Amino acid sequence: MKKFVLIASLLALVSASSFAQKTVDQTIDYTGFRNIEIKKAFEVEICPSETYSVQLSVDERIAENVIAAVNNNTLILDVDEKSYSKELKKELKAKNSIPPVLRVKVFCPILNKIVAGDKAVISASENIKADDLSIEFSNSVLARNLVIDAKAVKIKLLNKANARFDIYANEVEYSAENSSSATMVVNTNTMIVSASGSSVNTIDGEYNSVEVHARNSSATTFSGNGNKISVEGSGSSSVNADALSMREASVKLSNSSVCKINAKDNLKGELLGSSHLIYNSAPKIEIERIVNSTMTRSSDTKYNKNK
């Protein structure tokens, strides 16, 4: 693996403020990469470019421990914390210690995969363009207003990751687990959503078809317009698609799950456990089974449960 290490003696920039951290700046050029893996709490800005490079600005105390490496077509951003001196470890763990600066601009023309964890902050200067793009954010990653233009997009959020997306793609597959959350605007032909844990998801857009799998105590809200939607809900999950205007809907619920649906033409339902289906408009209704569950029109004032 070709490894680039920042040396503290390079280009140290000192702020006029005595409280500011001294930083080391460096630009590194690469022949190419298609993936990015961010392993520590870097603040990363993705910048579309015809060439491949990174611009780094990092705390001089840890500059020699910062790694920017390309391995197997993947740009890896990491910090070798095990090699910190005892004095530095003590300093960084001290009360009111300021986290080290770890700012990176990544320049590349196209990406296939972005993986980030450990409280990294991700943004982009312009639209991220790709053919097939895979994204996995975990461990309190914060993604700010990522605009994606691709043929197919696959997104997975875990462990308190929080993200804001604008997506233009033919296919979108989105998975949210644990206590992750996302807000997104989507323009797509097909969207598949898998929500579990206590994840919270807000999705607005234009779709042809939407497929939803909701489990545990997840909460997913849809708005926009489309052709057809299918929902499978279990646990105490909630799917609120009341503001999503669709022609057709198929809903299967179990346990204490709740679904609000807005189907203009046709609605098919199977309700088990103590589940509840609330529907809008006046569709043709086909019931496969209802066992210890309820189905009501949204205008029914007797039902005031908000999930």
Language model regions located:
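Flexible, active-site-adjacent loop/turn segments at secondary-structure boundaries
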Residues: 17, 42, 244
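Residue-level detector of intrinsically disordered/flexible regions characterized by low predicted structural confidence
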Residues: 4-5, 114-115, 203, 242
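N-terminal hydrophobic or amphipathic segments with adjacent small-residue motifs
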Residues: 3-6, 14, 34, 191, ...
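Acidic (Asp/Glu) and glycine-rich low-complexity loops/linkers
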Residues: 20-39, 43-158, 162-175, 183-185, ...
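Bacterial Sec-dependent N-terminal signal peptides
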Residues: 1-25
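Short, surface-exposed interaction patches in beta-rich subdomains
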Residues: 165-167, 182-307
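Intrinsically disordered and other compositionally biased segments
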Residues: 6-7, 11, 143, 182, ...
